[in-house]
A protein has these predicted regions:
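Conserved beta-strand positions in the central sheet of alpha/beta enzyme cores
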Residues: 35, 104-105
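C-terminal helical cap(s) of enzyme catalytic domains, especially alpha/beta-barrels
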Residues: 53, 108-134
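Conserved alpha/beta-domain cores
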Residues: 1-72, 78-98, 110
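Short coil/turn segments at secondary-structure boundaries
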Residues: 137-138
Length: 138
């Protein structure tokens, strides 16, 4: 982007299918952040493989020093429930432990009944993970 004169613009590359996974090495030097789009990826790979795919992409991003974002169904139950599931809290915690620079919610705040609670729980889980990392010297 610098060579185009747009130094204030951040570029995000969304990985949403096998083609994106295959192109990751090419994208890493050029993207400011990689978006691990689990909803789309979950349609491209068997669901039981999705966690490993997420971990592999995260590892490649860390190796390259490229920030990454984890998105899709972080707190999906909260579209209609005031309290998240334990699995959702663990998911956010683990995304932060894996080095995510960002976690993003979509439907939870766009169409959900408790958008402020969603952000509160998202922040609580992310903060707990950051605290865990600091306390354990990770």
């Amino acid at each position: 982007m610098n060579e185009c004169g747009g130094t204030d613009i951040r570029l995000f590359a969304k990985i949403e299918n096998r083609r994106g996974m295959d192109a990751l090495a090419e994208l890493l030097p050029h993207a400011d952040e990689i978006v691990i789009a689990r909803g789309d990826l979950g349609n491209a790979v068997p669901l039981w493989e999705l966690p490993a795919v997420q971990k592999r992409i995260a590892a490649r991003c860390r190796e390259n020093g490229t920030p990454f974002m984890v998105v899709t169904q972080m707190l999906a139950s909260m579209e209609h429930s005031r309290v998240p599931t334990r699995a959702e809290m663990s998911d956010i915690f683990n995304a932060v432990l894996d080095g995510a620079a960002s976690v993003m919610v979509t439907g939870e705040t766009a169409a959900g009944e408790y958008p402020a609670d969603v952000i509160r729980y998202l922040a609580l889980a992310a903060h707990a993970a950051e605290t865990f990392l600091k306390e354990n010297g990770i």
